[in-house]
Amino acid sequence: MQIFNYHNPFSGYHKAGTADIIYQQLFSFHRSKYCKYVPVYTDGSKTARHVGCGVVFNNTILNFTFHNSMSVFSAELTAILVALQHIIVPNHRHFCVYTDSMSALESLHFSTEHRHPTVIEILLLQKLERKGVDIIFSWVPGHVGILGNEQADTAARSMSDHMQRPVCYQDLKTSTQNYIHRVWQETWDQQVLNKLHSIHPSTSHWAALPVRRHVVRLSRLRIGHTRFTHRHLLLGENAPEYPSCKVPYSVYHILIDCPVFNHHRITFFHTSVLTLSDLVGETPH
C-alpha cells in the first residue's frame, strides 16, 4: 500500500548522459512552480570515521554527528526527520523537502512489513499537515551544482555536535559483520608463511565453479594435496622424488619450479615466471 508520495522533476534524465546545467535548469523550473514552498535541503554522509547529516533552509544550517555504526541510508533518513522537526517557523506553512537519496524516498513511499524505525518516525511527523502545514518531498540529484544540496552535503560531512540516536538492528548487524571481517583479514594478513595465503590473500569469498568435480580438483591443487603427490602417505612408502630435479613431488614444484615444464609455461602464459595465484587463484587457468 502506497502511503507517501514525492516529486521527481528529473525523471527520464540519466546522470551519466545529462550535463549539470540541464539539472540546474530543471530544478529552477521546479522552484518557480513551487515558489511559495520554502526549500529545505537534507543530506546524509558516511566515511570511515564520520557519520552525519545536514539540513539547510532559509538562513539556517543544521548538522549533527551520529554513531559510526549508522549506515548512510539511516543518516539520509535522519536528515529528513531532523528537517521535519525544525522547519516549523512563523509565517511559513508550505515546505518542500529535497533529498538526493532516492532509496530514502522509496522506503517512505512503499509500505513494508519491516520498516526502518526512522521511516516510522517520519511518517508520524507528517501529521503536521493536519495542523495546516503543507509539506511536499522531492528528489534532487547530488553534486550537480544545486546550491542548497551542496550546502547540505558540506554540512553533513563536517564535524558537529553528536546527536544521540538509536542505531537500528540492521545497521548494528552490518557494522558487526564488517568489524569481524576486518579483524579476520588483519589476522590472515599476518599468516605469510601459510601456503594458502599466497593463493588466497583475501578473506572474501570466491565464486564457485558450476561443475563440482572441477571444484574438487581445483581445491586439491590449491591446498597441494593430490593422489599423485601424497599417495605414498596412504601406502606407508617413502616420498618419491622427481628424477630430474631430485626433489619430492609437490604441486608447487610441478606447476611453478620444475624446468622440465618451462616450455609449457611459455607456450600457454608467455612467461616462465608464475605463481600459484596466477594458476589456481581467484581466476584459475
Predicted feature locations:
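RNase H-like, metal-dependent ribonuclease domains
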Residues: M1-D257, H264-H285
